[in-house]
Each structure stands twice: as structure tokens, then as C-alpha cells.
């Protein structure tokens, strides 16, 4: 068999969304990694400038956050506003300060020149909690969570275009393991509520429990 090819002939353009990265609250990925207000490399928002420079250099089109296994017990509301309680991270069994939350993640992505992609809690989360997160990020002023974002200093919506539901909730290792019937109902109802809050966003299919 012969396969002819022309090495210098362009045949199409790769979608930049093929090249992305993943940021989880795991070991030093966030604290001491991308975010460290005590570092001599920290900017005015606590982001490490050396990491931001690296992000701008490799040019990922998109970054997913907050997990990973971590997201299956993560409740986003603890990570916004001035009063943020420290919580126990049931995935990695450490204390989470919640100092780096939604607003910080979106700001980090904007500074790095990439799109923020939020993965919601498909383990212990609810459809309402997920849709409230969309409201906080994307609605201009309608609703208590959009108003809360404004009170937190972000008048304009974050306009997060990429969302998904859950992580590896098919596995026994994951908090909030679900069978196929439980999973399909959660995804269906969560997506329905999220889309009713803000329809025009991208919804990558979540992994399906077997």
C-alpha cells in the first residue's frame, strides 16, 4: 500500500481549543503554584508572574478548574466574597482556605489570555447549585447571585462560555459515585437549569457512569 502525501501543503487549521490545560486544588497546583501572594513573583492579585509568563508563552486556549476529584465535594459559594470559611477537602483530605475561588480563577485566565472552563460539582452538588454558579458568573444583574458578584467588585459578568458537569463520578474512588440512571437524571436536570439561566454557552459531554 502506498500513501501519497505532500508535506508542505496545508490541509486545514487546527481548532485552538484542542490545546488546553487543567488546574486542580491538588498539592501545589493552586496555592504556591499559580497563586501565592507571599511570593516575590506575585502581582497585585497574588498571581505568580513567572507562571503567567509561561502560560502566555505556551498559549493554551482554555483552562479547566477546579477539578478533578476535588470538584466532587466543592461548593463554589465558599470561594467568593470577603468572608470565606476554610473547609475540609474530602478528596485530598486537607484544609482548603477557599482564598482562590471563581473570581480569582477567571481573572487568572484573562491575564493569561485563555478561556476559563468551569467543571461543576457532580458528586455532592445539585442542579440548583450549578445553575446558581452560572448566574453568578454570567448574568448582568438579575438574581441574588449576579447581584452578589457585583457587590464583590465585579460589575460586569465573567461571561464564562465553557461549563461541564462532574468529573469521574462513575468510579468508586470518586465522592458522589453514581450509577447510570442517577447520573443521567442529574446531568439532564442540571444542564436544563443551567441553560435556562444563560443559554449561549458550550457544554462538553460529561463522562457517563457505566
Model-derived features with residue positions:
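Non-catalytic accessory regions flanking glycosidase/transglycosidase catalytic cores in CAZymes
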Residues: 1-210
Amino acid at each position: 500500500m502506498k500513501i501519497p502525501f505532500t508535506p508542505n501543503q496545508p490541509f486545514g487549521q487546527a481548532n485552538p481549543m484542542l490545546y488546553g490545560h487543567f488546574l486542580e486544588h491538588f498539592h501545589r497546583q493552586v496555592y504556591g503554584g499559580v497563586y501565592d501572594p507571599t511570593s516575590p513573583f506575585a502581582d497585585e492579585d497574588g498571581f505568580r508572574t513567572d507562571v503567567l509568563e509561561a502560560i502566555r508563552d505556551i498559549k493554551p486556549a482554555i483552562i479547566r478548574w477546579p477539578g478533578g476529584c476535588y470538584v466532587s465535594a466543592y461548593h463554589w459559594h465558599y470561594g467568593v466574597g470577603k468572608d470565606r470559611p476554610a473547609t475540609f477537602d474530602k478528596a485530598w483530605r486537607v484544609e482548603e482556605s477557599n482564598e482562590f475561588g471563581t473570581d480569582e480563577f477567571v481573572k487568572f485566565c484573562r491575564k493569561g489570555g485563555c478561556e476559563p472552563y468551569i467543571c461543576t460539582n457532580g458528586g455532592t452538588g445539585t442542579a440548583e447549585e450549578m445553575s446558581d454558579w452560572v448566574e453568578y458568573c454570567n448574568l448582568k444583574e438579575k438574581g441574588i447571585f449576579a447581584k452578589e458578584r457585583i457587590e464583590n467588585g465585579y460589575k460586569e459578568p465573567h461571561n464564562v462560555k465553557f461549563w461541564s458537569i462532574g468529573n469521574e463520578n462513575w468510579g468508586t474512588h470518586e465522592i458522589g459515585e453514581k450509577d447510570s440512571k442517577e447520573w443521567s437524571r442529574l446531568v439532564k436536570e442540571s444542564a436544563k437549569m443551567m441553560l435556562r439561566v444563560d443559554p449561549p454557552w458550550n457544554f462538553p459531554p460529561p463522562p457517563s457512569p457505566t
